[in-house]
Amino acid sequence: MALCHRSRPPDDGAGWVRRLVTARCRRVDGVRCTRTPRGRSEGGRWSRRDIHTRHTEKKHRHVFADGPAVVDGDRTRTWAQLYGRCAQLGDALRKQGCGRGDVVQCMLDNTAEMVEAQQGVAMSGATLGSVNTRLDAATVAYVVEHSDARLFIADERYEATCREALATLQNPPPLVVVGGQDDGYEALVESGDAAAPWTPPEDEWDALALNYTSGTTGRPKGVVVHHRGAYVQALSNAIDFGGLPADGGTRYLWTLPMFHCACPCAKEIAATAC
C-alpha cells in the first residue's frame, strides 16, 4: 500500500493540489515543524537529507546504460535511452510552464510513453495524474478540472473521449495526443533537451503523483503520493522481493493497468535492483 496523504479539497475545488503541494508545515513525530527547503527546521533543531526516487534513475542510467529498460511490443528502450527521453520530456514540460505545484494528467495504456510520463513529469517538477482509461467523458472532465491540470496527455485511442470531456470545460488544458498522424507527444518530447539541467524535488514531501479513486461512493477523490512515500515503498518492495540480481537479466511482466498505481510503480520495481 502506498504511503499517501489524503486531503479533502475545499468546496471550490480549484487549485487545492497546488496549495497542498506548496504547504510548508508538516507534522514530524507528532511535533508541528515549519521547514525550510532541504528539510531543516527554522530553529535548527533537526535536520535530514531528503529522499526520493531520482537517486535510482541516475543509478540505472550509468550502471545498466545499455540494458533493456522497457519492452513495448517491438520497441525496446535501454536505460540510457529511457533516461534521455524522460529528461527531454521534463525539459519540454518546463518550457510549457509546468513545474512545482502543477498537475499533468495522462490517459495512457501500459506503453513506453506511460513509463516516460511517470519519470518525465517528475523531472519537470510537476505532479503526475493518471486518468482511468475506462472513465466516460463526464468523469474525465471532472478529474481534469478538479485537479486543475496544466496539460493533458492522452493516447489516440482515447482522443475522442478526451476532446468531448475538454469541450465541456471553461478553461481546458492543452491536449497532447500520443500516436496518430501528427503525434503531438513525439513533437513535445523532441522540443526538450536531454542535457538540460534539472533538480530533485525541493522537498521530499512534495507531490509525486495524484491518483483519483473510482468514485463508488460519490465523486472521485484525489489521493496525493509524495516522493518520500514512493521511495520508502520502493525499499519495502526490495525487501519483500529479497532483492533482484544486478545482472540486468530480470524481467517484470506488467499486467495491471498502470493508472491504478501511477507514478510509484515503475520506480518501485526499478529500485529493487539497486
Ranges and model annotations:
Residues 68-111, 115-119, 136-141:
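Conserved AMP-binding/adenylate-forming core of the ANL superfamily
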Residues 135-165, 233-253:
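Conserved ATP-dependent adenylate/AMP-binding module captured primarily in the ANL superfamily
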Residues 160-204:
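ANL superfamily adenylate-forming
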Residues 46-69:
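A short N-terminal helical cap/helix-turn-helix that marks the beginning
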Residues 120-124, 251, 262-274:
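Conserved short alpha-helical elements in the N-terminal third of ANL/AMP-binding
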Residues 60, 70, 82, 86-89, ...:
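Adenylate-forming
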Residues 93-98, 195-206, 210-254, 266:
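Conserved adenylate-forming
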Residues 105-107, 114, 118, 122-153, ...:
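Short beta-strand->loop structural element characteristic of the AMP-binding/adenylate-forming
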